[in-house]
Amino acid sequence: MSTSGTGKMTRAQRRAAARRNRWTARVQPVIVEPLAAGQGKAIKAIAGYSISKWEASSDAITAKATNAMSITLPHELSSEKNKELKVGRVLLWLGLLPSVAGRIKACVAEKQAQAEAAFQVALAVADSSKEVVAAMYTDAFRGATLGDLLNLQIYLYASEAVPAKAVVVHLEVEHVRPTFDDFFTPVYR
């Protein structure tokens, strides 16, 4: 005698699960700047959240050394009220110019006295030699605020010397939608 809820899936459920896995299996090994049309896969923000995107070009990176880049908030989010907004998911991805050779790694970690130690404590690493050029932090920053992101740095490592502005670091942060003031200040006569 069979019992209900034994975990058996219907044919439609099995096909849907297989389709989901097929979508997530596509990974871009290296994202070449400028972005080609249709490259990557868009992920929607959770209801009530919005996504802020900003990018920074790296300075010249010396070979076999770890360099640090600070995170600066976009101008519209730098007010004290917006620094209190809760953060959801964070996406870090590397854009490499076609002229870049060798291995490039990037990670987000708290500010370190020794930059070399950042990759040991990093939450995830974006690596151009492996197929993880984008690092998605789904739960690591949940509950943090946008102001807390200012205590973070992006660390870059290159196996060969890289000129300035050859690596573009893109950071996308999902956060609670800011409440902008939609009304003009009342004018009293």
Curated annotation (Swiss-Prot):
UniProt keywords, alphabetically: Capsid protein, Ribonucleoprotein, RNA-binding, T=3 icosahedral capsid protein, Viral nucleoprotein, Virion
Location relative to the cell: Virion
Region feature (Disordered): 1-21
GO MF term set: RNA binding; structural molecule activity
Basic residues: bias regions: 11-21
Known function: Capsid protein. Binds specifically to the subgenomic RNA4 to ensure selective packaging.
Descriptive protein name: Capsid protein
Annotated organism of origin: Brome mosaic virus
